[in-house]
Amino acid sequence: MPTTIRDVAEAAGVSITTVSHVLSGRGRIAEGTRRRVEQAVADLAYRPNVHAQQLVTRKSRTVAIQVAGFADHVSSSALIPRSDYFLDLLNGAAEAAAERGYAVILTPPSADAATVEEFAVDGVIVVDPRGDEPLFSDRWHHPRRMVTTGRPTMVEQVAAVVDNDHRAAAVAMLEHLAEQGYRRPALMITTTARSYTSDVLEAYAAWTAARGMPPVVVTVDEPPTENAAAEALRSLLDRDPRPDAVYASAEDLALGVLHEAQRRGLRVPEELGVCSAVDSSVLQLTSPQVTGMFLHPRDIGRAAAGALLDVLDDAAAPPRDVHVPVELFARGSTLRRG
């Protein structure tokens, strides 16, 4: 017969209620008693009844993750955008949640409060939000139950924001271009409704202003595509003087710039440098390989899940920001000087 909670209580010399409190993390339990219960659980290989725990703690031990969608309906219907970044982030979040006994469900970008409530989740992680997504509605949204990766630009407060320092990352990339001899870098971005693109734009504007350089910015509609990037590059190349480098806010934009430049016979990196604010494995499949900023998305996912579960365990935990370091991978698309 399987081990029961009564067996654990008898082995530890405590009541069933005490065992329940130790397993659920509730109540004030003396450290010695806690250790005896934990030892009995280990010795007897006891596995708590998940459904019973949920009834006692009033928690489903399930969290939802929603990757914020794009403005167009087709792209917004996809659960996960075609990107290493999002896959790695989701894997990191799922790993961290599982380590603490939580399951993760993935909701479509269009899921509203009523849809999420049907799953009785304890909390939600929203990836790259604008802040106008259905989950931010007053009917459901509660700061204690939501963590975002990237600042929601239209919402004042959530339990935690996990992000990179995109301003510092942008400066690092622009300094790299300058070190390689580029003097007229242009910025290609999507909508600034998301915090990371607005941060990159602000950093670029400040960096060019400090050097007396005119900012050259071209904006493409979401979702970022290679075709949109190719069209945007054509407009940049019509300028006089034309840019000698393009800093793209997404990997698909960088790929589109590279392919259009090569189609036009421009030598990369000699005549045009190409780099991306988001690194991806696809940037290493081109010739030359494309310089990218690695954002450590798996660490972002782990940190987001950890921050959400910390809040669920301690309702008094204050809101916090978590910054995950970045790493610049300089590759052939910008290396003029080795």
Residue ranges and their predicted role:
Residues 110-120, 229-241:
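Short, well-structured alpha-helical segments in soluble
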Residues 46-115, 123:
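Amphipathic helical "hinge" segments at domain boundaries
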Residues 127-169, 252, 278-290:
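Flexible loop/hinge segments that line or gate small-molecule binding clefts
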